[in-house]
């Protein structure tokens, strides 16, 4: 399964990428929402993990644009974020996100959490 990971913090991006690769995923990484929109058509990911707060375009705007485009709307979006308050999670789900994973995340179980959200 191919994941597109959008995370602007290099250390978090590295840990998430290594954790997901160890869990058997193919991982493509980018640093912001604009880069997600630029590469989603060519990379054709099975799911997208989005950081909430990123430069240039945040995760919410990115998710909104992905879900508004018929070509990318079916791709599951999972937020990977420190902002997991109930109202913010509800907002993400209302935009069409499949779920949210809180930061800091457990590197040993990140891949399993992604699979659980995608299976729901």
Predicted segment positions?
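Receiver (REC) domain active-site loop signature in two-component systems and cognate sites
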Residues: 54
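Charged docking surfaces used in two-component/phosphorelay signaling
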Residues: 14-22
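Conserved acidic carboxylate
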Residues: 7
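Active-site residues of response regulator receiver
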Residues: 51, 81
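C-terminal output helix
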Residues: 105-114
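Short, glycine/charged-rich "phosphate-handling" switch motifs in NTP-dependent
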Residues: 98
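Short hydrophobic/Thr-rich beta-strand motif most characteristic of the beta2 strand and flanking loop
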Residues: 24-31, 39
